[in-house]
Amino acid sequence: MEHLTGKSWETLAREEVFKPFGLKNSSFTWHESFTATASAGHDEAGKPTPIDHFTEPYAGFSLYSTATDYNRFLQALRTGQGLKPATARLLHTPATAAERCGKAASAADPYIDWACGVGLASTSQGLAQWQWGDNGSFKGFFMTLPGRQESLLLFTNSANGSQLVEEVLQLFFGPGQYWATQWLTE
């Protein structure tokens, strides 16, 4: 995208996402203003890890955000806000099956697909959009249920944080089958 537009990733994110959706505390590069609210991560043993101060934007791993900001983004993702209807449909339409490169097929595979930029999962609560993040001592997960107008966002500052996801899904959305968590652990 940088090559096509001549703009940096940070500039594109600010112009197309952060400003339009009111994400005032989000950036792909470190800002000193984040110092007051940033949390240290914790490794598998529970020991604090340093906070990374990325000076260059990396789309896959350098996003700094708050739960409030990221939830605003999730609501736009869930509804397709700011997108043409045809583009918004791409966020809910399987584009490819979730194949694991070099890994054997799993029981969860038939229930997981990829749309444009987001995972799709069949759940007992309906079709869900989902994604996860893993920055070592920080783990993240989100799931939206567009049919129920609900979303769950989980940020943790622990290398063990992903162990909470299934239990939190069951508590928040209710008992049921959430194939995304099984897919992640297989």
Model features per residue range: what roles?
Residues 3-41, 45, 80-82:
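Active-site helix/loop module of the DD-peptidase/beta-lactamase fold
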Residues 14-15, 19, 45, 50-186:
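Catalytic loop of the DD-peptidase/beta-lactamase superfamily, centered on the K-T-G motif
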